[in-house]
Amino acid sequence: MKKVLLAFDGDSFSEGAFEFACSLNKKDQILLTGVFISRVDAKNLWAYSVGVPPAVVPLLEEDIEAESENIERFEDLCNLNNITCKVHKDYYGFAIPELKRETKFADVLLIGSETFYNNLGLGINDYMMNALHGAECPVLLIPESFIFPQRNILAYDGSDSSIYAIKQFSYLFPELCDNPTVLVYCEEENEEIPENEYVYELASQHFPKLKIMKLGGDPKWSFRSWIGEQQNALLISGAFGRSPLSQLFRKSFVSDIVKEHRLPVFIAHR
């Protein structure tokens, strides 16, 4: 049984992320822990990011009421769908350190706030950006509207992080590894796939329906164009968290994929 965290920010309730959790539970029973995070003052966020103890921000009455409604809804839906669940809350004032601790004791974190997706690349959703940057387990970003993945896309660039993501996904979700899978490498100037034999030897043991594909041209644009044609797929990537915190989602190609193509994205970074 996997322990899955489902994070809710503010008064939002992600139908997409919950639906994804339900689908996982049907394939292999999970423990679903709902983590309910209240909104905080941005100054406290940045105080935490630079190591300054944040001030306590009291919750407004409407925030408390919205959180209570979300918790009740979460528990009712879990009971209706036969999902074993727990609720973690009471993060008054500043929840990011607590969410980071939660991820330390979880297998995977699901995030599906529509507000989060709308802000990718447009404005900085500081709150959830900090949460993702500090996550100590793999993260699944879930669009609100999607079809449960029937194919896997392994984004490979020869880096240790891309190999790490492939391994983490296969360990966590063996039930999804039987889906048709393509390992994609974007080449420049007729480059060979880095350590081709080794990566094929590893990936083919976990993904029996594996194909390898090379895309030419500028890696960012060729991959973006190709993935726009893919449907019902899940992207597995290690390319997260390489940029400075303040620029993370502006520079990460993963955020572009989530924002533009609304594919579920599995991210694992060391």
Tell what function each PLM region has.
Residues C85-I142:
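Hydrophobic alpha-helical segments and helix pairs
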Residues M1-A55, G134, I147-L215, E229-N232:
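Small/aliphatic-rich secondary-structure junction motif
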Residues L6, I111-G112, L154, S237:
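Redox-cofactor binding/interface segments in oxidoreductases and associated redox assembly factors
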Residues R262-R270:
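Short, flexible loop segments at boundaries between secondary-structure elements
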Residues F13, N118, S243-L245:
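Short glycine-rich, flexible loops that bind phosphorylated cofactors or substrates
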Residues D76-L109, Q205-L235, A239-S255, L263:
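Structural beta-alpha unit
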Residues F36, S113, G238-F240, H269-R270:
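Short secondary-structure boundary segments
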Residues P54-E69:
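A short acidic, glycine-rich active-site loop
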